[in-house]
Swiss-Prot record:
Glycan-linked positions: 44
Peptidase S1 domain segment(s): 25-249
Tissue: Expressed by the venom gland.
Single GO BP term: proteolysis
Family according to the record: Belongs to the peptidase S1 family. Snake venom subfamily.
First-tier enzyme category under EC: hydrolase
GO cellular component: extracellular region; secretory granule
Name of the protein this chain belongs to: Snake venom serine protease Dav-PA
Organism: Deinagkistrodon acutus
Record function comment: Snake venom serine protease that has fibrinogenolytic activities. Also possess esterolysis and amidolytic activities. Selectively cleaves Arg-|-Xaa bonds.
PANTHER family, per database record: KALLIKREIN-1, KALLIKREIN-RELATED
PROSITE patterns for the chain: TRYPSIN_DOM (PS50240), TRYPSIN_HIS (PS00134), TRYPSIN_SER (PS00135)
Record has Disulfide bond as a keyword: yes
Length: 258
């Protein structure tokens, strides 16, 4: 009964935000070339595989499950086939994953902090996105973006990033859809109650931006993508700001919150 009440309230919230929402990431609209200056594309020997967020000239935040033994990061990218004059490529110098992470659980502390081998220079298509100053609230309008699949079942990867607006949902919605989502995991639940808008395969590690603040990291979701009862699950960035700042300051022994 409680869940039915939650879903009813969220549907009302969703309808109130409908006019603010763009088209779908899945089957939807190309991002404006100037709205993702902080978006990082991860490539390895097989090609593009994850996204990330530039938070200052030397540091990138992504998902822990995007870790790979051999990868590069490209910034200033829009089309993967058309070179921007200010694109920059970097290698990871150091990688930080929560030392108290349970490696058998992808949803547990799914965050990775990367120090670049060389600072990034701000340019027309490159600029960092600051860490959040406050936590997000349920009902917030959130922006998702990435080069992930734009079709929900058979993966179709675009050359350009796609964007959409979704809403931050009550955590109970995701707990109902994902029995494996434990209450202690520091995650956010975001999507559309009636389905159809979602991040998908290849969007992992990219940002969830709520009311202009970097609040989440694409972590986990259902297949096919875009199912209303199973919204996307995002690592809650605000809960890790202290850990991020301590590592940037040189305290590499810092532990993440439990």
């Amino acid at each position: 009964m409680v869940l039915i009440r939650v879903l009813a309230n969220l549907l009302i919230l969703q309808l109130s935000y409908a006019q603010k929402s763009s088209e779908l990431v899945i089957g939807g609209n190309e991002c404006d070339i100037n709205e993702h200056r902080f978006l990082v594309a991860f490539f390895n020997t097989t090609g593009f595989f994850c996204g990330g967020t530039l938070i200052n000239p030397e540091w990138v935040v992504t998902a822990a499950h995007c870790d790979s033994t051999d990868f590069q990061m490209q910034l200033g990218v829009h089309s993967k086939k058309v070179l921007n004059e200010d694109e920059q490529t970097r290698n990871p110098k150091e990688k930080f994953i929560c030392p108290n992470k349970n490696n058998n659980e992808v949803l547990d502390k799914d965050i990775m902090l990367i120090k670049l081998d060389k600072p990034i220079s701000n340019s027309k298509h490159i600029a960092p996105l600051s860490l959040p100053s406050s936590p997000p609230s349920v009902g917030s309008v959130c922006r998702i973006m990435g080069w992930g699949s734009i079709t929900p079942v058979k993966e179709t990867f675009p050359d350009v990033p796609y964007c959409a607006n979704i809403n931050l949902l009550d955590h109970a919605v995701c707990q109902a859809g994902y029995p494996e989502l434990l209450a202690e995991y520091r995650t956010l639940c975001a999507g559309i109650v009636q389905g159809g808008k979602d991040t998908c395969g290849g969007d992992s590690g990219g940002p969830l931006i709520c009311n202009g603040q970097f609040q989440g990291i694409v972590s986990y979701g259902a297949h096919p993508c875009g199912q209303g009862p199973k919204p996307g699950i995002y690592t809650n960035v605000f809960d890790y700001t202290d850990w991020i700042q301590r590592n940037i300051a040189g305290n590499t022994d810092a532990t993440c919150p439990p």
